[in-house]
Swiss-Prot record:
One of its GO terms (molecular function) is magnesium ion binding. It comes from Gluconobacter oxydans (strain 621H). The lineage of its organism: Bacteria, Pseudomonadati, Pseudomonadota, Alphaproteobacteria, Acetobacterales. One of its GO terms (biological process) is glycolytic process. The keyword Chloroplast does not apply. Binds a second Mg(2+) ion via substrate during catalysis. The gene is eno. This is Enolase.
């Protein structure tokens, strides 16, 4: 085993041009690991805290020099000499050093950067791919991509209230074929939107962000694109939504301003149910607001047997909030975002907790991403079976798809694509 000898950090840019933290860890063996930390736009109120400088003269106050300083001073002082393979002890040492329930003193962006860089350095020393080091010998399941090809909500400057409209190539035989199918559908969608007179600018996650008026219109364009690409709806390709409902929830009401509609929780559930009855939607993320526990209970009762109901803002990859949801029978799937909780150890604990309770897991990017493809490895390491990493454009998104293709090739005959096994009624 090797000890940590040095930790360095720097301010780099994410995919939105905002600063974020990058960390490098060096071991006594000479092995090194580097990790860049993503950032979200529609963030849950219960997420671990991302430390920003607040200095308006730099990056409009979004600088992360304080977080970088914590890495190179406070955290290095505690971790220098620690054995890199003891990931749990390393992560717990940083949690204890921070001393807050939400990592607000050192910053989850500082802590996560170190946590992931340590894992990468150790994997390099052991001459193992990261997915194998973290997941062990049974890490061989390639996830179904949830490809966000139409962006709305906080991810785009258009009237669409729902944040993400995704396709899932469940009928593909391999992840490489799934990515190819997604690319072909994406190209058809661009052609269809352009011919209808809509712009084909892309949003934060690489999906198109046209000025469509409703979710129904967006789903209609996607359905036509799937068929134009030669695939069968519901058989080759299914749909998924991320409503990010907290963003349009206030005073007990869900206000879809773009569509001119307003609902209570029951009405919002009926709205989603109608869409799911008319399109091959198999998964809905954050269909209701993060603290509308009563509404979520009704949502799960009404739709949970036939649809995957994913908690993102609801659970924020936090094992404690997840356990509350499991106990209450709320939702049936966890969205996994490493920066919501802030360490690799806690992320793996959340996935294990979800799997033990029979909840599905979806590994996820953030809207502010980097070229770091770590979530592709973690999706395979944890046997999640599903991954959200944006559309088929922008290299910050395609970097993850390209890494999945590499992993599948490395695994050879041992590789398995999750495919239709992720469906509730498969």
């Amino acid at each position: 085993m090797s000890a940590i000898v040095d930790i360095t950090s720097r301010e780099i840019l994410d995919s939105r041009g905002n600063p974020t933290v990058e960390v490098e860890v060096e071991l006594s063996s000479g092995a090194r690991g580097r990790a860049a930390v993503p950032s979200g736009a529609s963030t849950g109120a219960h997420e671990a805290v991302e430390l920003r400088d607040g200095d308006k003269s730099r990056y409009g106050g979004k600088g992360v020099l304080k977080a970088c300083s914590h890495v190179e001073n406070d955290i290095l002082e505690v971790l220098q000499g620690a054995e890199s393979e003891d990931q749990i002890a390393i992560d717990n040492a940083m949690i204890d050093l921070d001393g807050t329930p939400n990592k607000s003193r050192l910053g989850a962006n500082a802590i996560l950067g170190v946590s992931l860089a340590v894992a990468k350095a150790t994997a390099e020393e052991l001459e193992l791919p990261l997915y194998r080091y973290v997941g062990g010998a049974y890490a061989h399941l390639l996830p179904v991509p949830m490809m966000n090809i139409v962006n709305g909500g906080e991810h785009a400057d258009n009237p669409i209230d729902i944040q993400e409209f995704m396709i899932q190539p469940v009928g593909a035989p391999t992840v490489a074929d799934a990515i190819r199918m997604g690319s072909e559908i994406f190209a058809r969608l661009k052609k269809g939107l352009s011919e209808a007179g809509y712009n084909t600018n892309v949003g934060d996650e690489g999906g198109f962000a046209p000025n469509l008026k409703s979710a129904d219109e967006a789903l209609g364009f996607i359905a036509k694109s799937v068929e134009a690409a030669g695939y069968k709806l519901g058989e080759d390709v299914t749909f998924a939504l991320d409503c990010a409902a907290t963003e349009f929830y206030a005073d007990g009401r869900y206000n879809l301003k773009g569509e001119g509609k307003e609902f209570d929780a029951s009405g919002m559930i009926s709205y989603l149910e109608d869409l799911a009855n008319r399109y091959p939607i198999v998964s809905i993320e954050d269909g209701l607001a993060e603290d509308d526990w009563e509404g979520w209970a009704e949502l799960t009762t009404r739709l949970g047997k036939k649809l995957q109901l994913v908690g993102d803002d609801l659970f924020v990859t936090n094992p404690e909030r997840l356990r509350r949801g499991i106990k209450a029978g709320t939702g049936n799937a966890l969205l996994v975002k490493v920066n919501q909780i802030g360490t690799l150890t806690e992320t793996l604990e959340a996935v294990e907790t979800a799997h033990k309770a029979g909840y599905a897991c979806v590994m996820s990017h953030r809207s502010g991403e980097t070229e770091d493809s770590v979530i592709a490895d973690l999706a395979v390491a944890t046997n999640c079976g599903q991954i959200k990493t944006g559309s088929l454009s922008r290299s910050d998104r395609t970097a993850k798809y390209n890494q999945l293709i590499r992993i599948e090739q490395q695994l050879g005959s041992a590789a398995r694509y999750a495919g239709r096994s992720i469906l509730k009624n498969s």
